[in-house]
């Protein structure tokens, strides 16, 4: 079996990613990329990719730079995969990483590699007739508790209404993030207070403060201390992603677990988060960190360092399925993130959407990712 074609498909939603002062559900991603790898036997592997999709497409479609063996360093990612055996995921990951190293190593090139790696694992599962978690090494659980992942609303009443909406669906944990949070402490605290009161003491509240609001470590510490009375399970993304020493300063000063990592890439990057950053919870996004090939290494690294892993998963059911496989593979797992946005790129891409059951998501058991892409929907929203 050989790889016959590799492509990034660019999708556009008719709506715009937004948030307002109302309790209404945010629209979700405006643009999304899909990685599609087709083999000469007809097997197809898929992954979504939450990045600047046209740039990722350029990384994949770029030509081969040199015909000289061993000189791959500016090559388009497709040229590095076509004709190769898709089952050799570890070797192909490094082939893409080295072959793009002069324009890659991190950023959009690594994100494209991540999506292609997930698609290769999807092919492997379909070839062997096994779900990805079995190929990773095993399944420790059949289901994972999900938290509703959404944006901060603009006022306490809207926060209360939003929480009531999620708990009525069966969620036992809700994470609010971004939106207008972080601009004014006197405005922020009533939002967190409203969420906690609506959730009650038996459900979990998670807070994503949004690092786009630039803070010093001491400002971050003050923020965590201010919301600690509302018992957040964790506080996420307080500082710039590369501020490892600042994260250690915060993590050592507060009692609330500190989470970050959705912007991080490669196992080397997560080693920095553990050793320099000292964070409590790692949040690798499989479409950014390096795919399953790197995600498995992050899980092993976290287990050795006694850290939790809660993958970032905010796009479509494709990434949710991938994250469930990685979470099933962990010996200890607390949560999986569930993007509650109602836009078509979040909700319509697969024929068998992942459904909440009593606050949990079931780990897919079908071959590969265990979800089936609806190619009619892909064509409907495809722009490149």
Predicted regions and their residues:
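Flexible C-terminal active-site loop/helix
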Residues: 1-4, 9-11, 15, 32, ...
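Shared catalytic-loop signature of beta/alpha-barrel
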Residues: 225, 231, 242-360
């Amino acid at each position: 079996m050989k790889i016959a074609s590799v492509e990034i498909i660019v999708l556009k939603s008719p709506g715009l990613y937004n948030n307002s002062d109302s309790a209404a559900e945010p629209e979700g991603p405006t643009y999304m990329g899909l990685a599609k790898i087709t083999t000469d036997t007809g097997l197809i592997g898929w992954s979504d990719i939450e990045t600047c999709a046209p740039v990722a497409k350029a990384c994949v479609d770029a030509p081969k730079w040199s015909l000289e063996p061993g000189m791959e360093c500016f090559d388009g990612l497709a040229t590095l995969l076509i004709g190769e055996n898709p089952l050799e995921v570890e070797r192909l990951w490094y082939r893409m990483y080295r072959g793009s190293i002069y324009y890659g190593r991190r950023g959009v090139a690594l994100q494209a590699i991540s999506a292609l790696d997930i698609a290769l694992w999807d092919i492997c599962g379909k070839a062997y007739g096994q779900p990805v978690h079995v190929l990773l090494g095993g399944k420790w659980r059949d289901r994972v508790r999900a938290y509703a992942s959404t944006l901060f609303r603009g006022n306490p009443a809207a926060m209360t209404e939003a929480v009531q909406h999620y708990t009525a669906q069966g969620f036992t944990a809700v994470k609010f993030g971004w939106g207008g949070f972080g601009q004014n402490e006197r405005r922020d605290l009533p939002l967190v207070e409203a969420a906690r009161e609506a959730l009650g003491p038996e459900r979990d509240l998670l807070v994503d403060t949004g690092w786009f609001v630039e803070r010093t470590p001491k400002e971050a510490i003050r923020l965590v201390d201010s919301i600690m009375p509302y018992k957040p399970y964790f506080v996420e993304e307080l500082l710039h992603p590369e501020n490892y020493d600042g994260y250690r300063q915060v993590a050592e000063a507060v009692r609330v677990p500190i989470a970050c990592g959705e912007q991080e890439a490669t196992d080397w990057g997560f080693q920095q988060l553990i050793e320099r950053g000292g964070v409590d919870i790692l949040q690798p996004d499989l479409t950014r960190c390096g795919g399953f090939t790197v995600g498995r290494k992050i899980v092993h690294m976290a287990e050795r360092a006694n850290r939790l892993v809660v993958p970032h998963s905010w796009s479509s059911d494709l990434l949710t399925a991938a994250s469930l496989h990685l979470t099933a593979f962990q010996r200890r797992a607390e949560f999986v993130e569930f993007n509650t946005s109602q836009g078509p790129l979040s909700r319509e891409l697969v024929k068998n959407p992942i459904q909440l059951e009593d606050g949990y998501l079931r780990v897919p058991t079908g071959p590969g990712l265990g979800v089936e892409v609806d190619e009619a929907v892909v064509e409907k929203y495809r722009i490149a």
